[in-house]
């Protein structure tokens, strides 16, 4: 998966897809009560990027639904996966559960449109800290009595992006109601302004490939240097988050990689661990 980073304006959806992305990351900002309010990253972010682009949340989700609904004039078949980078650090932790419920309602009614046929992209809920796990718990429990529980079970995955201890990550996911390998993505990375070793990525890949692991997919963020992309692919990641998707597509065409990797399509399940 080529994961376009910081896609927070509606026009950026097509911009990143046209550059070769098949996935996008969207930053979700909340009000002080924990209700999703708009798309926004803010500073600091990445080198050579504007960090303050924003849309009202309802407008962006409406456009995202259109881009991922077959038959819609704005449908883009390339867009198979959306990572919601949930900026949950801006409100009191006591509101985490209610915030998760509110975001579940937004996805059900504004993205899925209360239908099995709209908003087909797979979703990863990405939280910045392990102690925000009640957001995931609430999101899942919203669908316990819903006729759309099948969409939760088919289309939603989970990630913690704060580079915290992976053994503890497993425990916290279980506390949130997520079983081992139940749609678990594990990210590792840092802003593109700083070089980061692949040690933690390799540890995550080892857990993913272990018979007793809890991870389905591993991704690295945020890179666009050709050498860094090659190193990440050689570490056997499943996804790369980037500001320059065309760099990833160029590397995938190189002799060393063209027979080892290909772009994921909608028919590639992001919850299944790939076995070579």
UniProtKB/Swiss-Prot annotation:
Binding site for Mg(2+): 25, 27, 85
Catalytic residues as annotated in Swiss-Prot or TrEMBL: 5, 41 (nucleophile)
Localization in the cell: Secreted
Keyword flag Cell membrane: no
Keywords, ordered alphabetically: Cytolysis, Dermonecrotic toxin, Disulfide bond, Hemolysis, Lipid degradation, Lipid metabolism, Lyase, Magnesium, Metal-binding, Secreted, Toxin
Cofactor(s) essential for the protein: Mg(2+)
Disulfide bond entries: 45-51, 47-193
GO molecular function, one term: lyase activity
Chemical reaction(s) catalysed: an N-(acyl)-sphingosylphosphocholine = an N-(acyl)-sphingosyl-1,3-cyclic phosphate + choline; an N-(acyl)-sphingosylphosphoethanolamine = an N-(acyl)-sphingosyl-1,3-cyclic phosphate + ethanolamine; a 1-acyl-sn-glycero-3-phosphocholine = a 1-acyl-sn-glycero-2,3-cyclic phosphate + choline; a 1-acyl-sn-glycero-3-phosphoethanolamine = a 1-acyl-sn-glycero-2,3-cyclic phosphate + ethanolamine
Entries under CDD domains matching the protein: GDPD_like_SMaseD_PLD (cd08576)
Cofactor binding note from Swiss-Prot or TrEMBL: Binds 1 Mg(2+) ion per subunit.
Record carries keyword Metal-binding: yes
GO cellular component entries: extracellular region
Tissue: Expressed by the venom gland.
Gene Ontology biological process: killing of cells of another organism; lipid catabolic process
EC identifiers of the protein: 4.6.1.-
Annotated family: Belongs to the arthropod phospholipase D family. Class II subfamily.
Main function: Dermonecrotic toxins cleave the phosphodiester linkage between the phosphate and headgroup of certain phospholipids (sphingolipid and lysolipid substrates), forming an alcohol (often choline) and a cyclic phosphate. This toxin acts on sphingomyelin (SM). It may also act on ceramide phosphoethanolamine (CPE), lysophosphatidylcholine (LPC) and lysophosphatidylethanolamine (LPE), but not on lysophosphatidylserine (LPS), and lysophosphatidylglycerol (LPG). It acts by transphosphatidylation, releasing exclusively cyclic phosphate products as second products.
Record-given protein name: Dermonecrotic toxin LlSicTox-alphaIV2iv
Organism the protein comes from: Loxosceles laeta
